[in-house]
């Protein structure tokens, strides 16, 4: 992940701040953090996840998938603003820069974000009372981590691989891991003979 200048700011300042570029930022510990651009593989996995969710929630229901809108978190007085790859909310979607009451949060793990997503964002997302599930979908290898709130407690499942499914309590059905990786080839790229 590309780092922004270490300029501390409040959440209110961050929400109106413009650095004059097309760079997207998250706010962590009062410091804006630039988000690395997504790869083609990352984008395809994100779209596949959205399709898998849409198949379960339908197009006419009260819940909607929101792509790359912000989530506001306040943890021990520290305001944070994350931009997950996908979130599902059953509230009206407004012009606000953030999502109200997400039920499901999806992060696609990239080489530069894996540790932050798993070590920081997952525990932070789990503090939101509305969130029932968090999915981490790896773009580096076919591996999915699912976290679910069950009877008020968070349960993390063993890492899931292709040909496995998991029961999504929020979506009310099984989700195949293969659905996230449709069209993705993880075989090593052939060696470039011209690079010798």
Regions found by a protein language model. Name each.
Residues 1-196:
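Gly/Pro/Ser/Thr-rich low-complexity, intrinsically disordered segments predominantly at protein N-termini
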């Amino acid at each position: 992940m590309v780092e922004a200048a270490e300029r501390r700011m409040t959440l209110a300042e961050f929400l109106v701040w413009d650095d004059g570029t097309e760079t997207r930022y998250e706010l962590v510990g009062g410091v804006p953090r630039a988000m690395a651009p997504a790869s083609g593989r990352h984008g395809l996995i994100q779209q596949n996840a959205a399709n898998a969710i849409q198949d379960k929630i339908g197009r006419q229901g009260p819940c909607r998938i929101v792509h790359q809108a912000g989530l506001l978190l306040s943890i021990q007085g520290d305001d944070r603003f994350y931009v997950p790859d996908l979130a599902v909310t059953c509230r009206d979607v407004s012009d606000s820069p953030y999502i109200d009451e997400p039920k499901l949060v999806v992060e696609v793990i990239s080489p530069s974000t894996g540790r932050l997503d798993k070590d920081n964002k997952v525990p932070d997302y789990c503090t939101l009372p509305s969130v029932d599930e968090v999915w981490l979908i790896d773009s580096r290898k076919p591996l999915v981590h699912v976290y679910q709130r069950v009877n008020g407690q968070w349960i993390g499942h063993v890492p899931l691989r292709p040909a496995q499914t998991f029961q999504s309590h929020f979506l009310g059905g099984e989700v195949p891991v293969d659905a996230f990786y449709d069209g993705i080839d993880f075989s090593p790229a052939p060696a470039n003979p011209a690079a010798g």
